[in-house]
Amino acid sequence: MSARMVIVTGLSGAGRNSVLRALEDIGYEAVDNPPLRIVETLVRGDKPLAVGVDARTRDFSAEDVLSTIDRLQTRGCVRPELIFITASPEALQRRFSETRRRHPLALAGTVSEGIETEQALTRTLRNAADWVIDTSELSLAGLRQIIDQRFGLGGPGMSITLVSFGYPSGLPQEADLVLDTRFLRNPHYIPDLRDRTGLDPQVRDYIRQDPDFPEFFERVSGLTDYLLPRFVREGKKYVMIAFGCTGGKHRSVSLVEMLGSRLRNADWNVLIEHRSLGSRSVGGAWKAMPGAHQGAPMPGVQK
């Protein structure tokens, strides 16, 4: 067997799309919701493949998904791993409420009815899964860490996640290092900057003018220059550095952006996550963070 393949399924709102994006970021070719009858044709060469299927997939049935996996194994070219993404009904209902989206299986019913219907449709897949990942109390960065640890290809090296957050929301539990930026001048008190964020160059320029900023940023840069190569030497595959401020919008975001730019210029593999803004950046491309739960600890992963 030469190719590696994972099939990602689960409950709507649990984070299946986030898992597919995480797999794509670490080198997989990701295909979402192809008709089941063509899945076997997608396996070619040594390129690792991630296929997303759910109740919206054409011709979907749990039995057909398992039959497809059996046929791929019989061919001998690949042994697909089945990942099932789940979350508690309370977490799913909260996410659908926050995004104001209708559950795809709710039809004229309620979100809770849609969740119950999908749980019944996918129960066989959950029972057959190689991995069950519960995202109820899992942050996006924590989910990405699990995916990288379990399904990483060993190519890109250590992954660095830089996180900005607001202290009222709590510290990121998965962080290896937390830095407090609240001693820096606060753009919140400048009327022209209050409604902007650290993604805005004007906000970053204002923070750079703080007399304490140059030495602080130099010391942070020196610390990362010292630590990161040693983390790599230790065999660490993932590290998270978090910056906090009062609201999680100005100072922490600015520091994450500036350090992220510096590390990317040094060819480090960097993911940026702004928890209070609900966004993330991979290689400089911004994406929304649907359903990301802030400041939550990582749960266990069932195998």
Swiss-Prot record:
Binding annotation for ATP: G10, L11, S12, G13, A14, G15, R16, N17
Lineage: superkingdom: Bacteria
Binding locations of GTP: D54, A55, R56, T57
GO molecular function, one term: ATP binding
Alphabetically ordered keywords of this record: ATP-binding, GTP-binding, Nucleotide-binding
Listed HAMAP family: RapZ_like
Role: Displays ATPase and GTPase activities.
NCBIfam families: PRK05416.1
Family as reported in the entry's similarity comment: Belongs to the RapZ-like family.
Name of the featured protein: Nucleotide-binding protein Acry_0446
Protein species of origin: Acidiphilium cryptum (strain JF-5)
